Amino acid sequence: MQLLKDRIRKDGIVKQGNVLKVDSFLNHQMDIELINEIGKEFKRLFEKEKITKILTIEASGIGIACIVAQYFNVPVVFAKKAQSINIEGEVFATKIESFTHKKTYDVIVSKKFLKPSDRVLIIDDFLANGCALVGLIDLVISSGASVEGIGIVIEKGFQSGGEIIREMGIHLESLAIVDSMNAEDGTVVFRGDK
């Protein structure tokens, strides 16, 4: 998605340790006009999948998932990273290791909100090593629902997550795939760049 790549080049900040900061427009302060375009693009990419539910994980994916869900006219469910007194009844649970925060989370979704009849589109802001997505896929499978696709805003193509998910045979669409980044000069090279 050229609009997204241009914005990453303009406002993204490359840090040491393969960190790409996009908090000025995507996952802290959110540019709703850009995210609307992201929502339209995911609708175009997954419109044949008959999606009934959007699933993401707290916190960065929630805003993006909500905009995407408007184009599909379906609810959003977000996996919580901790058991809460607000969640009543039984839950689907898995463990997810976070690349960003370097810790393992117990992640849960109430059984009330994922049913075997659901056709789920998973949405997230980043794909790095794939641990979060594998955990979300596990939650969907545990519910008996089907993963119809995964929409990622930014994939770090130099890490293994995309390959892991594609080898599972799941329809994965990443709007920008970063093949390399240089913290010294701030450059980002996207897949398909010449």
Curated annotation (Swiss-Prot):
Cellular component GO terms, alphabetically? cytoplasm
Q: Which SUPFAM superfamilies has this protein been placed in?
A: PRTase-like
Q: What is its main location?
A: cytoplasm
Instruction: Name where it's found.
Output: Cytoplasm
Q: Which GO terms describe its molecular function?
A: xanthine phosphoribosyltransferase activity
Asked whether the UniProt record includes Glycosyltransferase among its keywords, one would answer yes
Alphabetical list of InterPro entries matching this protein:
PRibTrfase_dom (IPR000836), PRTase-like (IPR029057), Pur/Pyrimidine_PRTase (IPR050118), Xanthine_PRibTrfase (IPR010079)
List of residues binding 5-phospho-alpha-D-ribose 1-diphosphate: 128-132
- What is this enzyme's EC? 2.4.2.22
Reactions that this protein is recorded to catalyse? XMP + diphosphate = xanthine + 5-phospho-alpha-D-ribose 1-diphosphate
Q: Which residues bind xanthine?
A: 20, 27, 156
**Keyword list, A-Z:** Cytoplasm, Glycosyltransferase, Purine salvage, Transferase
Complexes and interactors: Homodimer.
Family recorded in the similarity comment = Belongs to the purine/pyrimidine phosphoribosyltransferase family. Xpt subfamily.
Known HAMAP family for this protein? XPRTase
Q: Which protein are we looking at? A: Xanthine phosphoribosyltransferase
- Species this protein is from: Lachnoclostridium phytofermentans (strain ATCC 700394 / DSM 18823 / ISDg)
